[in-house]
């Protein structure tokens, strides 16, 4: 988990990266954004994550600059849309607030130094006169901003194991789709059984990425394969109605987001 900022300029930082690191930066930026925005995602104690707390639009702008440079070199990309979902507003106003550490000479120097440590044959020539033994500079955030579960009315989201099936029921087995019965899966089961209220809104993530099938959840029932709740179909929800849409990148099978205004009744 590391974003490289050898210069106090997103585009210039992307341009100076070699092919391997530039490609990986797209994925690492996406992972960092998810750790900042998606509850229970993990990694929130990592200093490279913490330094961006409170500045998701700025990190989104950095990620888009990296993608732009990657594509300009002739490569295919699948991350642009996912990164943009964290702060769609940056397209209309790219001059987003920047972290207070952005522009501090010592921080950018430390990133140049660590790039040399990773690939001296590439970066020694690009950053002449740079010390080659500096540790990373990871400033602490002015305020800790850890993604939390919604506090008010929720839209429950279910990631269907069969995206092409029109499910009338939601079934959560004792173990996760990966076969684990760990703490994270246990929290999903408890939410499904105890937190959900009869009649709560639900949306199903299925084959159509841009639209979610919506409905209302019925009472929890015991099933031979786990816990089950019937769904009363209601309609269709545009992905863009969830704010931010990136919350739907949550890898969990069952989770909640703030109830979109269009569903408030």
Predicted regions and their residues:
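Expand to "…catalyze enediolate/carbanion chemistry for C-C bond making/breaking, isomerization
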Residues: 1-150
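Residue-level recognition of well-ordered secondary-structure positions
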Residues: 30, 50, 116, 152-154, ...
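Structured alpha/beta reader/binder surfaces that contact nucleic acids or chromatin modification marks
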Residues: 58, 171-243
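Short, surface-exposed, polar/charged, turn-prone segments marking secondary-structure boundaries
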Residues: 71, 79-80, 179-181, 258-259
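Compositionally biased, charged N-terminal/linker segments
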Residues: 146-194, 265
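Contiguous surface segments at macromolecular interaction interfaces
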Residues: 149-166, 224-265
